Swiss-Prot record:
Cell wall formation. It is found in: Cytoplasm. It comes from Salmonella paratyphi A (strain AKU_12601). GO terms for cellular component: cytoplasm. The gene is murC. This is UDP-N-acetylmuramate--L-alanine ligase. InterPro entries: Mur-like_cat_sf (IPR036565), Mur_ligase_C (IPR004101), Mur_ligase_C_dom_sf (IPR036615), Mur_ligase_cen (IPR013221), Mur_ligase_N (IPR000713), MurCDEF_pg_biosynth (IPR050061), UDP-N-AcMur_Ala_ligase_MurC (IPR005758). Keywords: ATP-binding, Cell cycle, Cell division, Cell shape, Cell wall biogenesis/degradation, Cytoplasm, Ligase, Nucleotide-binding, Peptidoglycan synthesis. Its main location: cytoplasm. HAMAP family: MurC.
Length: 491
């Protein structure tokens, strides 16, 4: 580390000048990789380990990071600190070695908190919409020339990265409630998009515990900070009297401080008016579909307005918004003649949503923008516990499509739970009599099983949080055409 880099570090996190080498266990994850990228650009020596290369590790390697595709004790040698993701177990050999060598082991959010400590932090929390809202806030601040640092859980498509080091005082970050680690953060501004029952194992199955944790997160704001909250959400409306900080509400509700009105969707764009108390109305064109994205934009506008950002910069950023990876991500439109001999085309969209509320929002956006399309979904349930806990909600939501193909549950390290598998879910949906789901037991056969349900005027939603995104890219590469011998290069 040279003198110039050390000087930069002292100006950002003064006491972290004592740290030289930071090692990340599970560095290929989007959240971990984003923080590693910011720290690499700040001049720290970065190393990390994961099981396989991916775009995140490739980006970090290009920045000079050392990446190990294994988990071995010697990987943490000479590290000043070891950062671990919540997905890593305590018996990981690198964590064990770090403890034996008395190297501090911290969670991702603790490192993010250190980055935020000496900056104007804006943290975006909530069950749904965090990633997109983080990208919208970042885009507005960048358009206004404020050069923010951002750390996001998904790819910010305009920047081509999950995270970027800016040179201003602003740090915009997604705040993760899945393991309650967002309690480490002490931002100046916090957005809460909504609160629903998810990741309930963390909260011992107690929804009141989850709600109190969000309140505790907001109490990390200084008394002069601000909470920006969606008043359309019934849980947030219930919790507002307990926040104890300055608040700005947003939503379609008439009593919202920033109110969405006259929403219309035309194709992939939303058009609406934002009414702000004591400020001119904003007539917004948002380059993202769905009423849920209008709410995300309202949150971003509330924060930007509070900061005094020019309205023209806000409107430009939203109209040119390029979205985030795997959030209603348009992968192409393909002719069906080579696929199944039919005239016409099929659009292919990839989406990360894996909670019934998210899936429902994606379906509604697709129906609103393309009402005449045959809506086909390839769905991969994520985690047996989530499938069990939200089983009826999934069954209700998934009956809204015209054709449904379902992959096996992506376990994310969980053991199977009887009755919470894809076969059972398909049977339940079939018994409701609206659609006849197709169970896809072999991912290599997706294109072959998809072809017969396509009509020539289709919108295909590839939906889920597991490895189904790889399948979406594979379908795009082969232009939906079944292969004679489909290789599992996607799974």
């Amino acid at each position: 580390m040279n003198t110039q880099q050390l000087a930069k570090l002292r100006s950002i996190v003064p006491e972290m000048r004592r740290v030289r080498h930071i090692h990340f266990v599970g560095i290929g994850g989007a959240g971990m990789g984003g923080i590693a990228e910011v720290l690499a650009n700040e001049g720290y020596q970065i190393s990390g380990s994961d099981l396989a290369p991916n775009p995140v590790t490739q980006q970090l390697t290009s920045l000079g990071a050392t990446i190990f595709f294994n988990h071995r004790p010697e990987n943490v040698r000479d590290a000043s600190v070891v950062v671990v993701s919540s997905a890593i177990s305590s018996d990981n050999p690198e964590i064990v070695a770090a403890h034996e060598a008395r190297i501090p082991v911290i969670r991702r959010a603790e490192m993010l908190a250190e980055l935020m400590r000496f900056r104007h932090g804006i943290a975006i929390a909530g069950t749904h919409g965090k990633t997109t809202t983080t990208a919208m806030v970042s885009s507005i601040y960048a358009e206004a020339g404020l050069d923010p640092t951002f750390v996001n859980g998904g790819l910010v498509k305009a920047a081509g990265v999950h995270a970027r080091l800016g040179h201003s005082r602003y740090l915009i970050a997604e705040a993760d409630e899945s393991d309650a680690s967002f309690l480490h953060l002490q931002p100046m501004v916090a957005i809460v998009t909504n609160i629903e029952a998810d990741h309930m194992d963390t909260y011992h199955g107690d929804f009141e515990n989850l709600k109190q944790t969000f309140i505790n997160f907001l109490h990390n704001l200084p008394f002069y900070g601000r909470a920006v909250m969606c008043v359309d959400d019934p849980v947030i409306r219930e919790l507002l009297p307990r926040v104890g900080r300055q608040t700005t509400t947003y939503g379609f509700s008439e009593d919202a401080d920033v109110r969405v009105e006259d929403y219309q969707q035309i194709g992939p764009q939303g058009h609406f008016t934002l009414l702000r108390q004591g400020m001119p109305d904003l007539h917004v064109t948002l380059n993202a579909p769905g009423r849920h994205n209008a709410l995300n934009a309202a949150a971003a506008v509330a924060v930007a307005t509070e900061e005094g950002i020019d309205d023209d910069a806000i409107l430009r950023a939203l109209e040119s918004f390029q979205g985030t990876g795997r959030r209603f991500d348009f992968l192409g439109e393909f002719p069906l003649e080579p696929v199944n001999g039919k005239a016409g085309t099929a659009m292919l969209v990839d989406d990360y949503g894996h909670h019934p509320t998210e899936v429902d929002a994606t379906i509604k956006a697709a129906r609103a923008g393309w009402p005449d399309k045959n809506l086909v979904m390839l769905f991969q349930p994520h985690r047996y516990t989530r499938t069990r806990d939200l089983y009826d909600d999934f069954a209700n939501v998934l009956t809204q499509v015209d054709a449904l193909l379902m992959l096996d549950v992506y376990p994310a390290g969980e053991a199977p739970i009887p009755g919470a598998d894809s076969r059972s879910l398909c049977r339940t949906i079939r018994n409701r009599g609206k659609i006849d789901p197709i169970l896809v037991s072999d991912p290599a056969q997706v294109a072959t099983m998809l072809a017969p349900v396509l009509t020539g005027n289709d919108l295909i939603l590839v939906q889920g949080a597991g490895n189904v995104g790889k399948i979406a890219r594979y379908l795009s590469e082969i232009k939906l055409k079944p292969q004679i011998q489909e290789e599992e290069q996607h799974g």
